[in-house]
């Protein structure tokens, strides 16, 4: 008290610590685990510690209090909060059953890159909310860009049966019809870029080959009749 009185005589004023105390109480309650490590967090910790020292300093002047308070406010403002990864994690988890063989390669390749990027953000302790939101948006776009491949299971089965056929003894016309249908079926089977939206192409190849095989079988049946 005596020192303060002497200081006041010299024209200096003891600081009002009300604002500093309020800010110190507010920011002391922050969970720093929610903020990214680095220079910003270090500066905040230092400013908070300094504010605490000024608060308990009975001889602190107004300038000391104001400076300590402003440094604390600036440091708090500069803190960078970690991104909330909950929704991104759920989005990544939802892709667990996605299989490469079910999708067209172009869409899958884009999706794979986006998925890996999202996983890196999830593993990054320094990822900001902006990083998280960007990764989520890119992955969502990639997921909507995926296209299922056309179902070729029936086509594969009928091609297998067609390969086993012996064309000896059939008319040139029916053999030519069969060979054309078979070549078309194999070309469709080999096309890995046919999406589910192009299923009619696959179905048409199946039907053409079935009809060609039926023509051969009908010819054989007719030839065996007396």
Predicted regions and their residues:
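Beta-rich interaction/scaffold domains
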Residues: 1-226
């Amino acid at each position: 008290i005596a020192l303060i009185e002497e200081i006041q005589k010299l024209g200096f004023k003891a600081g009002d610590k009300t604002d500093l105390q309020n800010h110190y109480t507010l920011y002391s309650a922050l969970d720093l685990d929610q903020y990214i490590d680095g220079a910003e967090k270090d500066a905040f910790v230092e400013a908070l510690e300094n504010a605490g020292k000024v608060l308990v300093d009975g001889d602190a002047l107004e300038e000391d209090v104001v400076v300590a308070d402003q440094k604390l406010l600036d440091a708090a403002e500069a803190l960078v909060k970690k991104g909330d990864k909950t929704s991104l994690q759920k989005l990544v988890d939802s892709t667990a059953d996605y299989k490469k063989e079910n999708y067209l390669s172009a869409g899958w390749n884009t999706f794979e890159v986006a998925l890996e990027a999202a996983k890196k953000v999830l593993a990054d302790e320094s990822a900001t909310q902006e990083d998280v939101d960007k990764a989520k948006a890119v992955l969502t776009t990639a997921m909507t860009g995926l296209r299922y491949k056309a179902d070729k299971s029936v086509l594969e089965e009928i091609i297998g049966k067609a390969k086993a056929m012996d064309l000896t003894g059939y008319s040139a016309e029916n053999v030519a019809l069969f060979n054309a249908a078979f070549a078309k079926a194999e070309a469709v089977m080999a096309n890995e870029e046919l999406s589910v939206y192009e299923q009619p192409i696959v179905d048409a190849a199946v039907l053409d080959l079935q009809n060609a095989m039926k023509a051969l079988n009908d010819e054989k049946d007719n030839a065996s009749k007396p």
